[in-house]
Amino acid sequence: MTVSHEIGATKGRRSITIDRETPTDGYRENGWNVRASPLKDLCNPIRRIVDEMVGQANPDKSLISLAQGDPTVFGHLLPPKAAMEEVVGAFAACVHNGYTASAGMVEARDAVAARYSEENRRPLQAEDVFMTVGCSEALSHSFAALAVDGANILLPKPGFPLYETLCHRHGIKYKFYELDPENGWEIKLDDVRRLRDENTVAIVVNNPSNPCGAVFSEKHLRAICTTCEALHLPIIADEVYEDVFFDETRPFKSIAKFSGRVPVMAVSALSKRWLTPGWRIGWLVLHDYDHILQAAGVKLAINNLCQGSLGPPTPIQAAIPGIFQANEEIWLERTLTVLKSASTRCIERCARVRGLSVPCEPQGAMYMLLKMDPDAFKSEDGTYDDVVFAKRLLSEEAVLVLPGTCFHAPGYLRLVITVPDDELQEAWDRIEAFCERHSVERNFTDSPKEDVLVNGLIGKLQAMPVVDSVEDLQRES
């Protein structure tokens, strides 16, 4: 089977094909004996499902992808001008064309340390920071540095499937703790206490959350830290969506601010917060105030792991100090307004669709989860789960969404909210038509709580202008 490597490629991006029918037992002919490692069978769980959907989109309709976690694909969300100028200047200087320290350029590490130093705590130093090839490598180094024999890590459910892939890659076992949709997708801390054993080396905390769109309150962050301190459990904090929040009453705060003695390995990047995933630069920050990670050799392990890739591009590292110093508040506010407008639009449209609901209003990140009622849809074989829904929506309406099963959230669908309003409206027109065709004839009665939420959001939507891009906001300001 030949599959597309980038389903839903847009704006002139070509899809690359991969042959999945390569023999699994190697090549042994004419004296050759070439065999692949078990890594050939290791991939992001999303790929297993999405690859089956490739080529199934209705060819008579334009493809609308509500699946890609790349905020740049539609072209209406742009990085801050100052960031682009810093990078252009770094390349033009022609003094950053060589290698730098494998853990990162000192100036970049100093800038990251200054940005993430917390008040009333020992200031971070350059030695506490490791520059990485995107946030993915920062996560990989965090996992690998803790990968002792028999180790297990606690992962969120629903959660980003890369965590699971990294555990497999580094020989780490994993257990899933539950997030609670009835309480803003907060962590069920009783679950954490139950799952932690003598081989548990860390817990992954993703805030703001992919795929849930949750932003944890200060109260909940403190409760997480209190629990982890009692359990002597280090935290791997995936904060790549830092500062991407929609509610001023619940702003993003790093968990390291409340961690006490708990060591925190915090990862982030320019990719989502600055809308530059293709620049491939991230960082891993050790908030190790009691030197627990250092004494255990974890810090040394991360330093040695950095020698494998020699770090992200040197010119991008050189631009980091200037990017962090730039005044971009207006740009960030405008970007968040675009995302919030798309989120509100989705909630308003979902309220009109039989069988779909929004259990929890997104508070940040770039995603939302829709809950589907499997009994609301009819099928020939009597089954209608989230995977079936996503496949049929693609084949009939050429709208691509990710089934919640990709994130260990069966019965849900994940949508991105980085889509321009005109394409988002068209996608929802198709989703609504699809659900009408496949719905079981029955009455749907929303709960009073859902009515209040939806009516309130519709009111908000009607009171605000439709915002399609940062440029629209600039014209209005």
Regions found by a protein language model. Give the residues of each.
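Conserved core segment of the aminotransferase class I/II
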Residues: S4-G8, G12, I18-T24, K257-K340, ...
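PLP-dependent enzyme catalytic core of the Aspartate aminotransferase-like
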Residues: T2-S4, T10-K11, A114, E118, ...
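Helix C-cap/helix->beta junction micro-motif
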Residues: H170, A230-L231, V262, V353, ...
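Generic structural signal for small/hydrophobic residues in well-ordered secondary structure
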Residues: I49, L66, V112, V129, ...
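Conserved core of the PLP fold type I
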Residues: A92-T226, D243-F258, M265, L424, ...
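Conserved glycine-rich beta-strand-loop-beta hairpin in the small C-terminal domain of fold type I
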Residues: P321, L336-I347, V358-D375, G411
